[in-house]
Structure formats: C-alpha cells, structure tokens
Amino acid sequence: MIIIITMVIIIIYEIIDIMQLIRGDNYQSWVYSSESDLVAVDPWLTRKQLFPILGWLLYRDSEKSSYLEQHDQIDAVTHIIITAHFSDHLDLESLKKFKADIPIFTTAEAAKVLIKNHFTNTVIVKPHHKYQLGSFELEVYEAGSPYHSTTFAYTLRDVTSIIFHESHMVDSNLSFKNLNACILTVDQVKVLGFIKVSMGIEQAKKMQQKLNAEYLLATGIAPNKTKGLITWLLSIKENYSSLKGVNSACNETGDSLML
C-alpha cells in the first residue's frame, strides 16, 4: 500500500508543475525549481564572503557547502537573481562558477559590476515590471526604506504557486491576496543603534499577515556570524533559531518546501 501511495504521489508531481523552494546556504541564498528551470538567488559558493578590496571591513565564513555544490547543480542553474550590488548578495567569486552568458536579473549598480567582469546576459530590472524566467514569472517591487533605491523585492510564480522575497526591509505599502510563502528577515539589525536595516521577528510576523503568506521563511540569518570592522557599528537581535508560533520551513541548508 505504501509503495502504491508513493507511486501515486510521484505521478501527481510529474503531471502537476510543482514549485520547489530550497534554502541555498546558511545565510541568504535561495534556489527555486520548476519544470526544467532552476533559479538561484544571491548564490554563495565560496568558503568566505569578503568586502571588496578591504576584506577585513566585512567578511563571513561558510559553515558548510551550499545546496548547489552538495548536489552538483551549479551547471543546472538556468537563471540567476541578484537582489543588490552589496558583496554579500553579489559574490563575484561565486558567480564566476557559472557560464558568462547565464541570464542574470539584477539592479543597475550590480549590472555595472557584472558587465565589467564579462557577464554578457545581464537584465536590469525595474519596479512594477515582469520578466519571464523560463516557466517562472518574476515581478519586481520597490524595497522598503532605506533600501528603496539600491535593492528590490520580488514575487516569483509558476502555474501553481507564488512566493515573495525581500532581503532587507519590506515596503509597508505592499499587500497581496494570497502568497504560498514569504522570505523575510527576522533578525533585527540596526546601524548606529537607530537605522534599521533588517526586520525583527515581530515585524516579520506582522508583514507575513499583511502579505497573506502561508509560510514565513527566514533569510539573512545569523548576522552575528558576519565579522569585520563594520560590525562594530551594528546592534543585532537574533531570532532565527527560535521561530515560535510561526508557520516556518527551510531552516537548514538544503531544506526544501514543495508548493
């Protein structure tokens, strides 16, 4: 009986296009799979992320291999989304592991860096515009303050599911009728004690409710693991390891959610 049920589930998955959402690493990378498409967001595939030129200003060590490395999926990636030009989102050494002509959807500032480093298929995204990534549709939204001019939020949908991702602060004007999942920050980070650059858990839970999302997935986790001189300017309150009362998923590298 168990074998029959398993076979039925497999057949259903083959008939229906199921979106799979995967935590790409132990920080803020994500992977989406649907049909023959594999989309990587802010991929980090190196042992250490470094601030450009002056690495001692900001750096972070990887604790384990990324999902794409573990499963030998780097060459299977069909599209890349880079949400910001900051070095913890745009890791050049990681991106150099992909083909130079892979489609990359990103900001104007990030595109300058990519073009300078010989990537030939860069698309600069704009708020309220839609882009086709194979079987996925990418729709771009403005990020919340203070990131509204430097990064972006987005939804990614296929024929059955839709997710929302904001890597810093959500624009409080955004709302949706129905999301399968939202990927948000839950570890509050402030610069100089008053400029909030990452949401805390209570704000994230309120946004999950406002966005009408079934699941809340934590991103940008464990900010205390980021080191360097700049971190002395930050005040951090971590919550990612204790998401009580939250319908959450994908807590460890490689964990996935079928939507």
Where are these regions (language model features)?
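Catalytic core of the metallo-beta-lactamase
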Residues: 23-37, 132-181, 199-203
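Active-site environment of divalent metal-dependent phosphoester hydrolases
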Residues: 26-28, 46-48, 85-90, 111-113, ...
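Active-site neighborhood of phospho(di)ester-bond hydrolases with catalytic His/Asp-centered motifs
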Residues: 40-42, 77-88, 105-107, 163-169, ...
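Cap/insert and terminal regions of metallo-dependent hydrolase folds
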Residues: 109, 171-258
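Zn-dependent metallo-beta-lactamase
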Residues: 9-64, 210-213, 231, 252-255
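Active-site HxH/HxHxD metal-binding segment of metal-dependent hydrolases
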Residues: 50, 65-131
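Pre-active-site segment of Zn-dependent metallo-hydrolases
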Residues: 37-81, 93-94, 170-177
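Metallo-beta-lactamase
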Residues: 106-160, 248-259
